[in-house]
UniProtKB/Swiss-Prot annotation:
Gene Ontology CC terms: cytosol
Any one biological process term the GO annotation gives: putrescine catabolic process
Gene Ontology molecular functions: gamma-glutamyl-gamma-aminobutyrate hydrolase activity
Segments forming domain Glutamine amidotransferase type-1: 16-250
Name the record gives this protein: Gamma-glutamyl-gamma-aminobutyrate hydrolase
UniProt pathway annotation: Amine and polyamine degradation; putrescine degradation; 4-aminobutanoate from putrescine: step 4/4
Catalytic residue positions: 114 (nucleophile), 222, 224
Described purpose of this protein according to its UniProt entry: Involved in the breakdown of putrescine via hydrolysis of the gamma-glutamyl linkage of gamma-glutamyl-gamma-aminobutyrate.
Pfam families, per the entry: Peptidase_C26
Source species taxonomy: Bacteria, Pseudomonadati, Pseudomonadota, Gammaproteobacteria, Enterobacterales
Family matches, as SUPFAM superfamilies: Class I glutamine amidotransferase-like
Catalytic activity from the UniProt record: 4-(gamma-L-glutamylamino)butanoate + H2O = 4-aminobutanoate + L-glutamate
Name of the coding gene: puuD
Protein EC: 3.5.1.94
Length: 254
């Protein structure tokens, strides 16, 4: 039996909430299971690791950074807008912005989902639509909370893959496919540091990658949902996990 301790170590950014009156940081198991099924070893990253000296010690131990989704939203001041965000998680924002920039500098693989994509957009100088439902030209991208969870995560709309990017390389025989949709915010302005990898039929950005980086991919949908049952989702996670081999080889050449 393979020793999981030999698998690539993937740092997973946690989310803050409250449990019986106590400040708590958690991760949904679907995100962790997707990493394990793809051959990685997930390690939870609490927000205190945003401290620069701790982050500097942590990063050499990680083979990848995983930014899962969250009920919270990125604080608007981080992308130049005024106002408060009622569903904020400042600790996650602090860690995510710090670890994204540090990982990009060190060329560590990154996989970002939903809020994670939005963090990747903001960290590289872009901005967000705070309420997609107020943009008349856009589809309804939120889930129906009255439906059973299985139906909330059912395919909702198509995405069109842009040619010549990371996503098309991972999915060479698949230029468009259906995805689930469970988000109220989305990318508004994408910085020149990013490449748009896919869009929904209304033109909204559904996937991005960082230019001149071996693997820094963000997707707006949720491939972690029953990831082992869907070939497209497995390919994305396996691509992320195997990217660490290229990262190690690159470090050895330096």
């Amino acid at each position: 039996m393979e020793n999981i301790m030999n698998n690539p170590v993937i740092g997973v950014v946690m989310c803050r909430n409250r449990l019986k009156g106590h400040a708590t940081q958690t991760l949904q198991e679907k995100y962790l299971n997707a990493i394990i099924h793809a051959g990685g070893l997930p390690i939870a990253l609490p927000h205190a690791l945003a401290e620069p000296s701790l982050l500097e010690q942590l990063l050499p131990k990680l083979d990848g950074i995983y930014l899962p989704s969250s009920p919270s939203n990125v604080q608007p001041h981080l992308y130049g807008e005024n106002g408060d965000e009622p569903d904020a998680d400042p600790g996650r924002d602090l860690l995510s912005m710090a670890i994204i920039n540090a990982a990009l500098e060190r060329r560590i693989p990154i996989f970002a989902i939903c809020r994670g994509l939005q963090e990747l957009v903001v960290a590289t100088g872009g901005s967000l639509h705070r309420k997609l439902c107020e943009q008349p030209e856009l589809l309804e991208h939120r889930e129906d909370p009255e439906l059973p969870v299985e139906q909330q995560y059912a395919p909702s709309h198509e995405v069109q893959v842009e040619e010549g990017g990371l996503l098309s390389a991972l999915l060479p025989e698949c230029s468009n496919f259906w995805v689930n949709s469970l988000h109220g915010q989305g990318a508004k302005v994408v910085s020149p540091r990013l490449r748009v990898e896919a869009r929904s039929p209304d033109g909204l950005v559904e996937a991005v990658s960082v230019i001149n980086h071996p693997f820094a991919l963000g997707v707006q949908w949720h491939p972690e949902w029953n990831s082992s049952e869907y070939a497209l989702s497995r390919i994305l996670f396996e691509g992320f996990i195997t990217a660490w081999q290229h990262h190690i080889a690159e470090k050895q050449r330096l």
